[in-house]
From Swiss-Prot:
GO terms for biological process: defense response to Gram-negative bacterium; defense response to Gram-positive bacterium; detection of peptidoglycan; innate immune response; positive regulation of peptidoglycan recognition protein signaling pathway. Changing S183F: In strain: Loua, Monty5, P. bourg, Tahiti, Texas and S30. Disulfide bonds join C57-C63. SUPFAM superfamilies: N-acetylmuramoyl-L-alanine amidase-like. Glycans are attached at N181. Residues 1-18 form the signal peptide. One of its GO terms (molecular function) is peptidoglycan binding. This is Peptidoglycan-recognition protein SD. Coiled coil: none annotated. It is found in: Secreted. Residues 47-169 form the N-acetylmuramoyl-L-alanine amidase domain. Keywords: Disulfide bond, Glycoprotein, Immunity, Innate immunity, Secreted, Signal. It comes from the Eukaryota.
Amino acid sequence: MTWIGLLIVGLTAIAVQGEVPIVTRAEWNAKPPNGAIDSMETPLPRAVIAHTAGGACADDVTCSQHMQNLQNFQMSKQKFSDIGYHYLIGGNGKVYEGRSPSQRGAFAGPNNDGSLGIAFIGNFEERAPNKEALDAAKELLEQAVKQAQLVEGYKLLGHRQVSATKSPGEALYALIQQWPNWSEEM
């Protein structure tokens, strides 16, 4: 490799350092929304951690398939206009783009307004997500503050605090209570 090639590679690494890579909707083959979605003003005061409660994924192909299946289910069976969460975290340690943070989510009923929905792909009732997934979520939260998607002093909540659900599962719920910005109250 020439010195110019090394310089370009080095500059690229510097440009992306500190930002969690996000798998875009186009990359996981999302459908477009099938209806209007209410907007929200960002930065948001809350981040809500959930789990999808279904199967987990550990590689790019399987995680993308889970994203497509979840979107199909939420749009056809739950009658949402799009996938309900803003971001999802795969067991491969990657963050998947859901709906825009400036659009109201569809995961917490009346508490969707003002909440950034982040769901881990899988069921985390008995076991926690792996380190790669947990690290990706923590980096995503930091990045969301830097990008003015969340206010600096946002409240971190578990899905069960804003909805009648077991989500994000006992194992994951116990972990997020130790994270920065954790809040007992909305």
